[in-house]
Amino acid sequence: MASQTAVAARGAYRQILRATRVAFQNDFRVLIAARQEARQQFDKHRREGIDTPMQINHAKEVADILRHNIVQGVRDGSDEASKWELRIHDDIERGDNDSIKIGGKNVKIEKACSA
């Protein structure tokens, strides 16, 4: 039977794979590169150590960022003046930009970005 840490690590790895599928849909070159990097990082830390829970947490945070904060764009034409089309999917985090409207005033941040 696998240890809890191994199960958590496999779960985090699966989260990264799912997040790369969502973030890099139809961009196979970047999708393959992201998955290879994830695999290399997990293989590098294959043995369980003191920092394993932190590494698992880091992997989950990476998956969350990939899923909610990465937007890809494709240029409509081949010239520099052509417009970019952004692929914004349902999981993308959308802000309201209220802090931009405040201007030069001090902005109080209620919570951390990762909260």
From Swiss-Prot:
Disulphide connectivity of cysteines: none
Top-level taxonomic group: Eukaryota
GO molecular function terms attached to this record: protein folding chaperone
Keywords from the UniProt entry: Chaperone, Mitochondrion, Transit peptide
Keyword Lipid biosynthesis: no
Location of the protein in the cell: Mitochondrion matrix
Transit peptide extent on chain: 1-36
Biological process according to GO: mitochondrial respiratory chain complex III assembly
Protein's UniProt keywords contain Transit peptide: yes
Xref: Pfam families: Complex1_LYR
Entries under InterPro entries matching the protein: Complex1_LYR_dom (IPR008011), Complex1_LYR_LYRM7 (IPR045298), MZM1/LYRM7 (IPR050435)
Family: Belongs to the complex I LYR family. MZM1 subfamily.
Subunit relationships: Interacts with RIP1.
Function: Assembly factor required for Rieske Fe-S protein RIP1 incorporation into the cytochrome b-c1 (CIII) complex. Functions as a chaperone, binding to this subunit within the mitochondrial matrix and stabilizing it prior to its translocation and insertion into the late CIII dimeric intermediate within the mitochondrial inner membrane. Modulates the mitochondrial matrix zinc pool.
Designated name of the protein: Mitochondrial zinc maintenance protein 1, mitochondrial
Gene: MZM1
